[in-house]
């Protein structure tokens, strides 16, 4: 059947290949060239690559049109090649910049190869490392407050919420073409203000960093003192937290999360080692416990446990940056990243929460690692490793937080005017009307090279006294070997014709002026004519730049590097002469108008002080230091980790993890790929999680200030 269909397709004119692998195939009657003939495929491929330098995006894989042929099809082609005594390419030649499919690479090579930027492993580990640490250490305490059965049910529910919302954000960021959480929310629902989302991300990031530092202050001094590495380390908790900034600060100033991809594996390894130690110690501790195991324990602390479990899966501020850096972000790869990250977190959280609760029953502390004996050296090694993972968790959270802070500052403080920049000693910058000679614009699937052509002598000013001859000679040499776009050539002809008409009119007017009395009036008319001519030249130059930027890709000769300098010098001379010959009244009016606008702008933004503050805050190092300082001061005075985690999970995690993804889902991919009933049901479920999380935050606040909702100690024991 397959061979018959294949032969029929060859008779029609070529081999039918999948859409993502389709290449130009010769007809069946044309035999492939022999070994003596020159290889035409390479020349055709090179010409094709030169004409279209960018590859179109591949369609999503499906069962009907896979990216690569199946094994049966490959075997049939190999048999046919052997019988016909000729060799046909099974796959199309891989162009430069493309990578082989992972399906053809053995899993051993993929598993133990270095982690590349934007790979599946790097994305999964970065997502998992973003939430491992502070949340997982409070899960045994949350399991104690709710009971074993309810705690496991909450873990399963929050795992699904984490997976589904991560997939929503990553797929929607590709759908809307956005790279930040705030931009994605604003594009999905324009009613959502971008500043509010950025502010939520900033506050959530600072709170998460606070929880990391609180746990670090509990772990690091105790482990160093019990391992006899630093005697009396518990008395120097503040000094150790300040010393950790030496490692946290350099990692936090990195502009991208992919810079930390080689460190993202360490928190996972540290937690795996801690899990193995918890399992080993639980074999002895379970036999010593006599308290009953509670399967269901409903009280007011249920809401605190709900938020603790929710915060344990909080990774969503890093989803959009990771999706932006993901290589080949197709739907299957996005699905794999979301599912694998959620399953990895669930497989680590469930045994730690269960065994941590069963090992200590009703006396589990908010940081369950503090329940172990102070003489247990093995657990102190675990706490030391977890301390290092906390140190790495702060930069993973702070990098997207600083990006949102930059976006918030840019939206609050508009770009300063030229006089305000000059007041601070900054030289004003003029926008050039000429685009760069070789301007490369890179998008997801397109690399476009545009060429800006310089003026010829006819299209220039035309006067030798203004340097037109020198500029014409310079541009004449630059134009050799550069193919002019078809859209620009009619404009050049029109500009040359207009300049020739003006030169003839100028010559006729000079011949008609026979007396000296009208020479002054003639000079004034000549100045007006030259001013109009320069304005026409400037407009023509701008239209040429636009036409050249929208033209298709052209090959540029290696000797055309001086063409850009000639264009820029010609444009600068034109603007300078136009400013020199501007009437004094117009110049004074223009300067007065600029000064008035300057004073109004300074009054709105608070003057030069606000401008200087904006310049300082645009520095990433200053912004990171401004974020870490208040977080460090709060970590020095706080010691209740679960309360901090519960408040964060209620106020911010519910917004970023369920509320905003539900709105993005309903307005974006849910409106396209889901039925109305399914879409509404999922949105109601996510909004329900949001409401419970917000109500839990209120309960935690009331319990903290001893207002109400207190749980008797007899219920816990």
Curated annotation (Swiss-Prot):
Gene Ontology MF, one: L-amino acid transmembrane transporter activity
Function comment: Putative amino acid transporter. Probably transports arginine. Involved in maintaining the osmotic homeostasis of the digestive vacuole. Required for extracellular parasite survival and bradyzoite differentiation.
Entry keyword set: Amino-acid transport, Membrane, Transmembrane, Transmembrane helix, Transport, Vacuole
Membrane topology per record: Multi-pass membrane protein
Residue ranges, annotated region (Disordered): 1-88, 462-602
Compositional bias of kind Polar residues: 16-25
Record gene name: AAT1
The keyword Transit peptide is assigned to this record: no
Mutant phenotype after disruption: Reduced survival of extracellular parasites. Altered morphology in bradyzoites. Increased cyst burden in chronically infected mice. Unstable inter-conversion between tachyzoites and bradyzoites.
Transmembrane segments: 124-143, 149-170, 196-216, 236-253, 265-283, 303-320, 341-358, 378-402, 622-638, 644-669, 681-702
Domain of life the protein comes from: Eukaryota
GO cellular component: vacuolar membrane
Compartment(s) where it occurs, according to its Swiss-Prot or TrEMBL record: Vacuole membrane
Name used for this protein in its record: Putative amino acid transporter AAT1
Biased composition (Basic and acidic residues): 1-10, 74-88, 497-519, 584-602
Cleaved signal peptide residues: none
Keyword flag Nucleotide-binding: no
Low complexity composition bias: residue spans: 26-53, 463-477, 547-558
Protein family (similarity comment): Belongs to the amino acid/polyamine transporter 2 family.
């Amino acid at each position: 059947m397959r061979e018959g269909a294949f032969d029929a397709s060859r008779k029609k004119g070529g081999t039918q290949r999948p859409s993502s692998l389709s290449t130009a195939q010769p007809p069946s009657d044309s035999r492939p060239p022999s070994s003596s003939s020159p290889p035409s495929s390479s020349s055709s491929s090179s010409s094709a690559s030169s004409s279209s330098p960018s590859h179109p995006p591949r369609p999503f894989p499906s069962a009907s049109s896979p990216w690569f042929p199946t094994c049966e099809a490959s075997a049939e082609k190999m048999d046919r090649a052997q019988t016909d005594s000729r060799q046909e390419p099974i796959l199309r030649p891989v162009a430069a910049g493309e990578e082989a499919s992972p399906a053809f690479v053995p899993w051993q090579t993929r598993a133990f190869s270095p982690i590349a930027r934007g790979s599946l492993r790097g994305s999964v580990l970065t997502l998992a490392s973003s939430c491992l640490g502070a949340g997982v250490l409070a899960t045994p305490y949350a399991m104690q407050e709710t009971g074993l059965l309810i705690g496991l049910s909450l873990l399963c529910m929050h795992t699904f919420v984490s997976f589904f919302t991560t997939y929503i954000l990553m797929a929607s960021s590709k759908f809307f073409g956005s790279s930040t959480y705030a931009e994605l929310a604003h594009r999905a629902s324009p009613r959502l203000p971008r500043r509010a989302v950025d502010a939520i991300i900033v506050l959530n990031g600072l709170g998460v960093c606070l929880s990391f530092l609180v746990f670090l202050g509990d772990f690091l001094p105790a482990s160093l003192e019990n391992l006899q590495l630093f005697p009396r380390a518990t008395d120097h908790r503040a000094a150790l937290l300040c010393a950790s900034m030496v490692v946290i600060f350099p990692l936090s100033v990195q502009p991208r999360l992919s810079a930390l991809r080689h460190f993202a594996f360490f928190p996972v390894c540290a937690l795996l080692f801690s899990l193995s130690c918890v399992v080993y110690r639980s074999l002895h501790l379970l036999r010593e416990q006599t308290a009953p195991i509670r399967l269901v324990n409903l009280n007011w602390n249920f809401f605190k446990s709900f938020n603790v479990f929710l915060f344990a899966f909080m990774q969503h501020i890093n989803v959009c940056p990771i999706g932006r850096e993901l290589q080949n972000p197709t739907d299957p790869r996005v699905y794999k990243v979301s599912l694998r990250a959620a399953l990895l977190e669930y497989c680590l959280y469930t045994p730690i929460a269960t065994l941590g609760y069963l090992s200590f029953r009703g006396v589990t502390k908010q940081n369950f690692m503090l329940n172990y004996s102070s003489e247990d050296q093995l657990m102190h090694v675990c706490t030391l490793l977890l301390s290092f993972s906390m140190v790495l968790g702060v930069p993973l959270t702070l990098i997207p937080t600083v990006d949102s802070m930059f976006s918030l500052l840019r939206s609050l403080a508009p770009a300063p005017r030229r006089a305000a920049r000059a007041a601070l000693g900054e030289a004003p910058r003029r926008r050039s009307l000429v685009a760069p000679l070789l301007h490369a614009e890179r998008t997801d699937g397109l690399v476009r090279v545009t060429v800006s052509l310089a003026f010829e002598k006819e299209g220039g000013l035309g006067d030798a006294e203004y340097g037109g001859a020198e500029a014409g000679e310079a541009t004449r040499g630059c134009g050799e070997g550069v193919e002019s776009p078809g859209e620009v050539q009619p404009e050049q002809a029109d500009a040359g014709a207009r300049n020739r008409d003006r030169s003839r009119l100028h010559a006729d007017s000079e011949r008609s002026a026979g007396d000296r009395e009208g020479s002054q009036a003639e000079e004034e008319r000549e100045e007006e004519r030259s001013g109009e001519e320069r304005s026409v030249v400037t407009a023509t130059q701008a239209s040429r730049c636009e036409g050249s930027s929208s033209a298709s890709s052209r090959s540029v000769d290696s000797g055309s590097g001086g063409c850009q300098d000639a264009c820029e010098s010609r444009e600068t001379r034109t603007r300078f002469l136009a400013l020199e010959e501007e009437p004094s009244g117009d110049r004074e009016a223009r300067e007065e108008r600029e000064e008035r606008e300057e004073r109004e702008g300074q009054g709105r933004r608070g003057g030069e002080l606000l401008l200087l503050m904006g310049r300082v805050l645009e520095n990433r190092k200053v912004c990171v230091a401004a974020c870490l300082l208040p977080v460090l001061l709060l970590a020095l005075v706080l010691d209740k980790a679960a309360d901090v985690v519960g408040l964060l999970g209620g106020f911010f995690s519910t917004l970023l993890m369920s509320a905003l993804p539900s709105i993005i889902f309903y307005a974006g991919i849910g409106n396209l790929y889901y039925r109305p009933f399914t879409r509404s049901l999922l949105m109601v479920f996510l909004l329900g999680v949001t409401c419970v999380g917000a109500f839990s935050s209120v309960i935690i606040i009331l319990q903290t200030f001893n207002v109400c909702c207190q749980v008797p100690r007899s219920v816990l024991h």
